[in-house]
């Protein structure tokens, strides 16, 4: 009788083990496309890797690729050079739709975890320039000196779209006697400090280190995005958002802007049980993630499944987890 009872207990116990724990017996080798060493996304990738190594089978490896960036990361997945990648909602949507930064549709992308943080498309002017709005800049055709991120980056594409929404182009600004210089974060910051640039248009987080440092040495105006421009930018997947007051020195008022969250995407051929486990581990460890990087304080696990609004298909393994948790009906 006791023997039969023990057998019954073992059978019931085996059914209680999550499916992915039973199926994942062999090591998993994953590559996650992030960004340069020291970037927020590289830290994100390292943080995820640390959590995943604790739950994946012994011998599993996770390589965080120290290159890429939002537009490039989708291509790395398509080429088979990465299994996972960070992107922004708008830019992943461009990849799926084959527009803006992409000449054709990328059909292998799926979503795992969204709403990881909050990025803002900020236009930051030095006070000495006297510029208080991009609308004023367009109307007066001022010979402004603009800096942004390198060509092909999310920041440079975003600057181009933002200027176009205000009726400006790079060529027009140059014809007014101004300049447009896509460059590195360090060079852009230095040019703003040295008075060689008037406006820096950049995709930033709240408390972005380079902008925070700039605000300590240079008086700045954080230019608001007009409501009509916000609506135009929405056509490209940007969301209406607000930079809270006092995030940066001298920025004592809320600033209406557009922006987007970081998302984790994966190749559609990633095994379902792996996708399930990776998703579960991130969703259930927000506290640990916040310890690793402050950007995760804006992570919204309850919204992480909402890829439908960006026309990005959800990976079946991730969808299974969200339905099990009652997040999706």
What is the predicted role of each segment?
Residues 27-55, 60-64, 121-194, 308-317:
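Bilobed "Venus flytrap"/periplasmic-binding protein-like clamshell domains
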Residues 194, 199, 204-216, 222, ...:
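An extracytoplasmic/periplasmic, membrane-proximal ligand-sensing/linker region
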Residues 1-4:
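Positively charged n-region of N-terminal signal peptides that target proteins for export
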Residues 138-161, 240-308:
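Ligand-binding clefts/hinges and TM-proximal coupling segments of bilobed small-molecule sensing domains
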Residues 89-91, 99-101, 111, 125, ...:
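Pocket-lining segment of extracytoplasmic ligand-binding domains
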Residues 6-15:
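Bacterial N-terminal signal peptides
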């Amino acid at each position: 009788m006791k023997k039969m009872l023990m057998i019954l207990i073992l059978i019931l116990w085996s059914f209680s083990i999550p499916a992915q724990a039973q199926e994942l017996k062999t090591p998993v080798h994953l590559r996650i496309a992030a960004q340069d060493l020291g970037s927020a996304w590289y830290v994100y990738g390292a943080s995820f890797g640390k959590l995943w190594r604790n739950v994946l089978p012994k011998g599993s490896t996770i390589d965080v690729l120290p290159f890429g960036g939002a537009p490039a990361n989708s291509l790395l997945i398509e080429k088979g050079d990465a299994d996972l990648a960070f992107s922004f909602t708008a830019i992943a949507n461009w990849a799926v739709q084959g527009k803006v930064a992409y000449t054709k549709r990328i059909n292998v992308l799926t979503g795992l975890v969204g709403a990881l943080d909050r990025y803002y498309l900020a236009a930051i002017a030095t006070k000495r320039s006297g510029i208080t709005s991009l609308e004023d800049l367009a109307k007066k055709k001022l010979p402004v000196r603009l800096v942004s991120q390198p060509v092909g980056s999310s920041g440079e594409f975003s600057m181009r779209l933002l200027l176009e929404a205000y009726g400006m182009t790079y060529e027009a600004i140059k014809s007014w006697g101004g300049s447009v210089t896509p460059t590195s974060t360090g060079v852009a910051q230095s040019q703003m400090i040295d008075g060689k640039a008037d406006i820096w248009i950049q995709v930033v987080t709240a408390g972005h280190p380079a902008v925070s440092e700039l605000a300590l040495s240079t008086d700045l105006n954080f230019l608001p995005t007009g409501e009509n421009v916000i609506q135009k930018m929405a056509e490209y997947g940007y969301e209406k958002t607000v930079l809270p007051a006092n995030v940066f020195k001298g920025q004592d008022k809320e600033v209406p802007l557009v922006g987007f969250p970081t998302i984790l995407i994966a190749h559609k051929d990633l095994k379902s049980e792996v996708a399930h486990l990776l998703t579960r581990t991130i969703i259930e460890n927000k506290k640990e993630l916040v310890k690793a990087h402050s950007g995760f304080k804006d992570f919204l696990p309850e919204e992480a499944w909402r890829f439908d609004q960006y026309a990005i298909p959800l990976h079946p393994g991730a969808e299974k987890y969200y339905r099990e948790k009652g997040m999706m009906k």
